[in-house]
């Protein structure tokens, strides 16, 4: 057939094709094998109507079915289409190249007269835009949009080019708008030969510099497809030729949707390095934490409900540096250690045999900031005042569970927990009956630093105890004016103007809490500007330097306005400046030592050697002293003589004197020789003497049983109160709640009958003899147990030996006087 005839037939024919979605059955395929039996026009295409009934199908699944059927029938029936007509198959079973695969749109079947049909290069597949005339490679161009419907399935076509939409090399920087890729719907049908369909991996919101910088952060991340899309014909041909050689990542579409994540997060999902807790984050200085060996902090909360303590272990943070980035496997242990009282009784022996209550949390592995969030419950007994609650944090080796070490610990005395509960409630805790409902009382809810083993067994370090000192709280910075004016702190040879600020004097207005609490004598560089202006009626200091009048830095001491002036001493005139008139007080500045009175306790501690203190205005002759001074000197001599006789226990006596009533005279405070000897004989004489009670209480404090002496003294004071008053009833309730009630902060050792009788007496009505029975029981207990050990203690023996030494010294002196 000539070319002109081919063009003529091309213009007249109406070309149509088989749809990709058509489902060809086996009956339709058989109609193409033997076309002599088919009569309906629906069994053949338009080209078969034009060229004849023996024309093969054009393309699609029908063409594939015909080819397979021809190959199967070629062995048995080689002449299917007739005796004089032979079929020639030009295709083979070996795969063709990718650039030539698209050219074979249908099977090239020769006719009986050996004339071949025309080439169908311009035949366009269905559902694809017709590209017109031009290069044959342009027929493979598909839709350029990166979004593809989920209903489209690529399984309907065989050996076709994979779409450019399936390439993960597509980058959003080629578009002019911000792009967000979200899967429209999961694709359930995939072609296993071509690999699963994947959307391009890119951030949710991206732009050109952002995406380039993002992929450049991690050099280990390598994209599967390095070439980018270029809108040019040559680049398109190159990408289509290399499409079959690219590898597809075998990752399922239905897995975790990680297309909006950063490539570093998708491929290298490891814990972040460098985010380690530091002491500065919790207000603690790093140097101090290293010096005290503080390795972390743990957050605890405690609440008390009657006899039940709830300990909640919240979370912790372990301090470590970047040089040691290892994670910690840790757990927390809480132990309630029972410590019986020093009194040897049957109840204390039973309490000593009681086992400790121990709890521990779960093990948190490889974490420097673990979160435990576990609660433990402890029940306090009657003799729990001396018990200790110890919280310990252990670090365990991940490979060997037997290897562990203490990261830190802390100790909470039960007596202090009960004391805090009483402070929160307002009354001594617990002041409830067992049948009354009780609410939870919050004791602690804060962080506690992990101390080492030695310090943690004795105390705890809460986070609120850290003193955060800033630059404006430092005394070195408070002496400089914020307005930029200078403050004179040294006696230099310069001059100051009339309106210049003076040296500040510490008083109630200018002195803060820091200076009231300190007794330092050096106030230079610490004092703040005085709020009083001595040159005008206003109380503000003027920072402007103006005025021609000058005053030299000579300070004059003003006399006190509280003293009566009779006649001035000759020494007072020397304190004034010789260049100025003594009556010109307009430019005089008050001295630090005596100018302003009533400046607080720190005023008397200020001393300066450069300024002379003013003399007294009342004249008195030399070598004259008042009667008051004589009495003071005589009292001091008597005190020295008493201390010399007492010998090595003078410090103890001084301490006891400071604790006792200061109004007592010296003779009533220090015991005589007969009193000390009487203490050794009778326990009642020891209790009836105030010094003896103080000394005996000091001994009981060493044995942790001073609550017995405190209860005895409170009962003695209660006997002196009047009956029937409200204060008497309130005092009785306080004594019962503090000493007699069960689980009280200072519970004394009483039997159950005595405790019940005392409780009934308090409820019946407060009388002077309400605590008589309990007081007698405690007195008997002290006389049989503590008093005997007191007589053998070094505190009493030193006092007794001191009087014996003085007796030996007095005997030789008395014999000399007789001679």
Swiss-Prot record:
Organism per entry? Caenorhabditis elegans
Q: What gene codes for this chain?
A: rgs-7
Question: Would you kindly state one Gene Ontology biological process term found in this protein's UniProt entry?
Answer: negative regulation of signal transduction
* Every C2 domain range: 290-429
Compositional bias per record (Polar residues), positions renumbered to this chain: 32-44, 173-185, 517-533, 559-568, 617-632
User: Can you quote the domain comment?
Assistant: The C2 and the RGS domains are both required for its inhibitory effect on G-protein signaling.
Q: Compositionally biased, Basic and acidic residues: which spans? A: 112-124, 234-259
- What's a Gene Ontology MF term here? GTPase activator activity
Q: What is this protein called?
A: Regulator of G-protein signaling rgs-7
Q: Which GO terms describe its cellular component?
A: cell cortex
Q: Which residues does the UniProt record annotate as the domain RGS? A: 682-800
Query: What does the function comment of this entry state?
Result: Inhibits signal transduction by increasing the GTPase activity of G protein alpha subunit egl-30 (G-alpha(q)), thereby driving it into its inactive GDP-bound form. May organize egl-30 into a stable multiprotein signaling complex, and thereby persistently inhibit egl-30 when triggered by calcium or phospholipids.
Assembly information from the UniProt record: Interacts with egl-30.
Query: Does this UniProt record's set of keywords contain Oxidoreductase?
Result: no
Annotated stretches, region: Disordered? 1-51, 112-135, 149-259, 515-594, 617-640
The UniProt keyword set, sorted, is: Signal transduction inhibitor
Show the ranges annotated as biased composition (Low complexity): 149-166
